[in-house]
Amino acid sequence: MALLVLGLAGCARPTDRGQQYLDGEFDQVLNPVSTVSSDKPRDYHEFKQQMELVLERSPSMAATYQSLYRQVENWAENSGDPATLGNYGIDLAQMGGGDGYGNVMFTGYFSPVIELRHQPDATYRYPVYAMPKCGTSCPNRTAIYAGALDGQGLELGYSASMLDIFMMEVQGSGFVHFEDNDQLQYFAYNGKNGHPYVSIGKVLIERGEVPREKMSLKAISEWAAKQDDATVRELLEQNPSFVFFKPSSTLDVMGSAGIPLQAHAAVAADRKYLPMGSVLLAEVPQLDREGKWNGKHVLKLLMALDTGGAVKKNHLDLYHGMGHEAGIDAGHYKHFGRVWKLGLHGSLPAMP
């Protein structure tokens, strides 16, 4: 009966998360097309700063992409109409979407800011760890919480919230504020323990604690605020994976391409299809403050500059910036938009 219900539900094409059905069916992740037809409002202004950072910081990516970047910049400044991209020597490959109708999933990530102290006390007692020398036999989360890394000098600071540290692990990096000397520092990703990742959001859904349709980072935080420390710890221990950090000498938020990320211009992507530095034209779904699609998309230029373990094929993870509000916005995203990879004439679907 359950399978029958699911089958019947699948007959109606969903549109509640920004899905569109405008271009027929696709059978590949990247599908060469001759033109883009989009009447969405345009906003390309974040792309230029992201492009300049790539050209300044990465000679190798500059050598590969500079000609494309300048052509895209010329188009954005003098036309901006996606129907004219071919006039600027730019070819297109549309992403097929997980459903085969061009609906690419957008999720979001951000850089949290958490409060730390250099020394533990009765409140700030949960450590943030640097990478231990444990090779392929690193302890899992339960063992680490039980003290498996104690006495190794790996503590970078102490938080009052086990969940805050966990959320920084999920994002892969974040900012920390040491109130004892009013220092803001960026903690970059420094590796993980090699154990499999388990979604605590999925665990809460399966336990009936949070409805599937309301699941978000905000929903997890609200649930945790009502629990005692032992209950929160038990939930976090369902995920044996553990992320380690290293202090950065700058406040730049770096993606895996080694380039500072600009909010709403950088995405994590599957580098098998979108190598680092790839340029994307995307109809990005817009959400209201409650995290629901507001019926609109905005046409943006994006750049693939990061990766993620869960970001595969027709999935983009949009960087939202730093701080609490960015986290709320990013945590709501699991919506859809059309996406095209851009390349110089004759280059697609491969790299330009």
Predicted region positions:
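Sec-dependent signal peptide recognition
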Residues: M1-A2
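C-terminal motif of bacterial Sec signal peptides marking the signal peptidase cleavage site
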Residues: L8-G10
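Solvent-exposed, well-ordered loop and adjacent helix/strand elements within mature globular domains
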Residues: A12-P352
